[in-house]
Amino acid sequence: MTPIRARYLSVVLVAAAVGFASGSASAALAQGMPTTGPDVTVVDIYDIDSYGGANGFHGYAVGTTSCNIGDDELNWCNTGSCGGGLSSKQHPVIAQNLYRLKAGRFEQIGMSWLKHGFFATNKGNAQTCKVGTSCITPPLGFQQLGIGCTDTYWAGLNGDQPLGPRSEVNATTSNFIFPYTNVGFSQVYDQRVKVADADVDPAQNAGALYWVEGQYVSDNDAAAGNGLNNASYRKATVSPGTFALNMEPDNPPGYFATVREHSAIHAWPAIDPAVELFYVDVPGAVIERFEVARKVTAVDGDTWHYEYAIHNVNSDRSARAFSVDFADPTPISAAGFHDIDSHSGEPYSTADWTPVATPGTGTVSWSTSTFASDPNANALRWATLYSFWFDADAPPSTAVQTIELFKPGSPTAVTFTFPLFSDGFQSHNLTAWSAAVP
């Protein structure tokens, strides 16, 4: 597989009396560590279907091969007659996304609704699934994904309309409504990975790089605490004229273009070692994770340009605000925001978060409505990524970041710094911190 560059830190946050959380850096998380219980991940982005376009948008779907790398069977029931006491709600759902890196900014530009799993084929592939383990046929057959077994949903399946709304799924626990609500569809992009033509047109995106991503959410995987490695990504290209998406090939032999057990935000530091990537975990019965990537560039001797991308991995509580606070009342300017709009009948607002940089405070913030005022506000929900940027007359060593959570609970917010690069690394010499992750 492709080596991931840069160091990844995990922050475990403990609620303080004021409702905020604080934390410290712990050891980097290593891919492929042994897990207890069922553990589903995407071992291969299998294929991509391009459905054409209309009204300035194109529709796509991503094929995914899943694998149970854990030590127990994964539930895969979506009928009322499953054995083992399983209910029809105990099956995975599959989300698909598209991301772009353009001119130093990492953004999500496409998202799908959800494919509900209906049948596990339980194929064996020791090379691409659980190395050294053959597929163990599960007791309930196709109603489970066995240990070391794979199952492929090609793009045509994952893009087969109708799909299920994301709004009906709690990604932290994998509790969801089933049968899902069928709202109907009329366009080729409805419920699929919907992307604006302007975001993929090669003529308008010179030098841009693209990645597709697949993520599974499953009930007994989440209950076992294994829901943080369920996404994988793969580089893609866009064909001029047709805007068809194409996968990066598995070439040379032994090289796997799909990067396993990491969400697509990891592609940014893999491409650019000046990017810092930080895990922010919200404590609870099941950990809820945000991944925060940051790149700071010295514009001149007194001004720095800041680029942030925040990815919600599995947090049902979601986020409603993000702020960066500097120690001094530094001037802040040129603040901006990019999100990914819900579509095809989801109930959520698509109103942008407006940046606010109050003079004399040294703070810039973005926010949407509170949950109490609008439960369908444009919160940063699971499997989505929002981007933020600004200029400041202050180095990154003085920046303190805060994510305010959307749904009620404790803590109400998480506050963190980037300790690994707290000296700013104005020289951009990050060689000492660049390493392959196993």
Predicted segments with their positions:
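Solvent-exposed N-terminal domain segments of exported/luminal and surface proteins
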Residues: T36-S239
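Low-complexity, intrinsically disordered segments enriched in Ser/Thr together with acidic residues
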Residues: V183-Q204, S367-T398
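Low-complexity, acidic Ser/Thr/Pro/Gly-rich terminal tails and inter-domain linkers that flank the onset
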Residues: D250-G301
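Solvent-exposed beta-hairpin/edge-strand motifs
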Residues: A321-T350
